[in-house]
């Protein structure tokens, strides 16, 4: 029995080379991880995935990369702690759940980063801070100082005070990650996902192509995706494309 090597095209080789060059030369890197990546099938924080993420980010930091992690997961962690099956629709309840879950989320990260002697810091933001010039500069200065101290900031939306009706929310952390990238002048934004990539059509189609590279997010690209949310999270591929547009 012979095992055939998968066929690798010239374009795929070039894409890999470009990605490696960007990663190698990037000084500041923003990594965004969503709830679906951080949780298991039961909606609980997945300790193995958090451990893997902390390990990889710590390795980047050890290479003198300045790394910022934008992480969702507070609501999911709070729902698990309070034994809730569905994401609360009532705003006050949702914010209370997020407050409970944020502690569990940060404890999980802290535990894993400590195994690599890597210090992390919590930074909670709302859109209000980045809309106001003075607050914007304060946030920027704080993040830059943390990075200069070789600390990995863990950024999340402050769900306990962010109110969508008052436009103080980012809508999802994909947009927050893009804003933090611009705020810091980071050369690289990595958005982690629980799917293989961007499909040129339905992911359920047997012959649907995965797009290795997207040069520009236009109407054609956006037509491939749809808004998706579930009991634990908001976002989906559409919000990721909107964030980088």
Which residues does each predicted region cover?
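Nucleotide/pyrophosphate-binding catalytic subdomain
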Residues: 2, 11-245
């Amino acid at each position: 029995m012979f095992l055939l090597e998968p066929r690798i095209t010239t374009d795929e080789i070039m894409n890999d080379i470009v990605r490696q060059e960007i990663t190698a030369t990037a000084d500041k890197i923003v990594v965004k991880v969503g709830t679906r990546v951080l949780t298991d099938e039961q909606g609980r924080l997945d300790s193995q995935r958090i451990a893997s993420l902390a390990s990889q980010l710590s390795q980047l930091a050890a290479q003198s990369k300045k790394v910022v992690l934008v992480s969702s997961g507070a609501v999911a962690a709070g729902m698990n702690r309070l034994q809730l099956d569905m994401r609360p629709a009532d705003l006050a309840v949702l914010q209370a759940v997020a407050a409970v879950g944020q502690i569990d989320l940060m404890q999980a990260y802290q535990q894993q980063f400590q195994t690599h002697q890597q210090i992390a810091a919590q930074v909670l933001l709302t859109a209000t801070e980045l809309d106001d010039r003075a607050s914007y500069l304060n946030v920027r200065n704080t993040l830059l100082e943390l990075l200069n101290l070789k600390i990995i900031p863990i950024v999340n939306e402050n769900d306990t005070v962010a109110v969508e009706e008052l436009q103080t929310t980012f809508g999802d952390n994909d947009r927050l990650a893009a804003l933090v990238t611009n705020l810091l002048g980071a050369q690289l934004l990595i958005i982690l996902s629980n799917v293989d990539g961007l499909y040129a059509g339905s992911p359920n189609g047997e012959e649907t192509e995965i797009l290795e590279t997207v040069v520009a997010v236009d109407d054609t690209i956006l037509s491939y995706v749809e808004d998706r949310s579930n009991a634990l999270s908001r976002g989906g591929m559409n919000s990721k494309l909107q964030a980088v547009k």
